């Protein structure tokens, strides 16, 4: 225990961001240590190794993880890194470790073990207990997932019935929690599945899926986890491939969403290169495709509230969203009882929206609109706001009941237009109309001296639909069909703002040429001029007019008072 506390203290001191950015919380650092150790970036902590752990090695571990995930290589537990660590992913470690990854040039990784035969057998022994997918659909999806690898190599796969004296090479199970191997599942979200590399051990090649996930295929609303995409990834492990950092690789450790029609799916070049390094190229003869087609479950009629009419599916390209939030690296767009999800890659999970109450389990049925949402930095909880109340979720599960906005420092009966956590100072901002409040999550209390005028964010539109911060640290204000970008560390919008939201965020056609959205008025000093200047300086490091550098220490003490 003492060793762990010393390691946490060392990480807090060495991996903290510069003074202008918020320091990582102890909980985030603990998550980072556990995550980096679990997935192979740090050795397991014990006395002999902890004494040899250097600041450079700790930073290297985080940088390699960031490189693997396609993040800026800061070497710090910044918000984007923490959000990525909280994303659903494969259970297996990113096996090569720091030294191998630093030297590595190719993206794919090989486990060092292969099957010594070219014809492999497989069987699904147990099926998901509470899935919309039939057992036949699950078997067909597994067949197509294996075919994706067989088409690019000299491997063939045969499904076998119940064992007659010998188990198949690849035995597939849907299991929960501890299930007699070294990789227990953790319930909904988190780790999704794992598979074992080839070998002579009875468990070699076996593939396990977390039965507490909501497994789907062909989902029209983006709900659940696509079984085919995860199966293709795990079978890559079962054939001897490790994780890849290539952007388009199915072997990336993080879940990337559906990959399309199984009959048309093809591996990326990086995945083909890794597979053919192990088994050679596919023969010229056509691959024997499965004769069955995977069928999505029949569409279920949407459940309508008892005393209200059904809501038509809105057009995402019209903008005018009720709320927009960055939740664990994905951007959520809320509109009425619907929402869309944008992956970190910039791709929509689905062009069709998901239903609010099917996803956020426990949200009261009478809540038909989410006015604001954000992920709380200190513990990863997700807060949804509607009217003068908010609800707290752990992943998709509601914790407790409705809570009043007065807990966050707002007057009784007040509502919010936007809520966001600003990484430059770790504070939470609550916007209503032309003013905003600020809340200190670490101290669990509202900051004094608020509300303040929103014009201090120079160029921001009044009454925004919402405000969110990207994984890169830029702040975005949204209103109508446009957005205003504030570069990292700045509270002054870019000169070309506003920009159309649809083509840049939601895969919509560019708007026809016409009048631009009106630009908000330029910020003007409020009655307390000094207070206004402090706001501008402490957030962005920029001043309305040149000020001698020697005066800066006298005028501002840092971002904490923003």
Swiss-Prot record:
Gene Ontology cellular component terms for the protein in this record: extracellular matrix; extracellular space; membrane; plasma membrane; side of membrane; specific granule membrane
Cofactor, free-text remark: Binds 1 zinc ion per subunit.
Signal peptide, first to last residue: 1-21
Principal place of residence: membrane
Superkingdom, taxonomy of origin: Eukaryota
Keywords: Calcium, Cell membrane, Cleavage on pair of basic residues, Disulfide bond, Extracellular matrix, Glycoprotein, GPI-anchor, Hydrolase, Lipoprotein, Membrane, Metal-binding, Metalloprotease, Protease, Repeat, Secreted, Signal, Zinc, Zymogen
Matching PANTHER family: MATRIX METALLOPROTEINASE, MATRIX METALLOPROTEINASE-25
Domain statement: The conserved cysteine present in the cysteine-switch motif binds the catalytic zinc ion, thus inhibiting the enzyme. The dissociation of the cysteine from the zinc ion upon the activation-peptide release activates the enzyme.
Name under which the protein is recorded: Matrix metalloproteinase-25
Organism per entry: Homo sapiens
Organism lineage: Eukaryota, Metazoa, Chordata, Craniata, Vertebrata
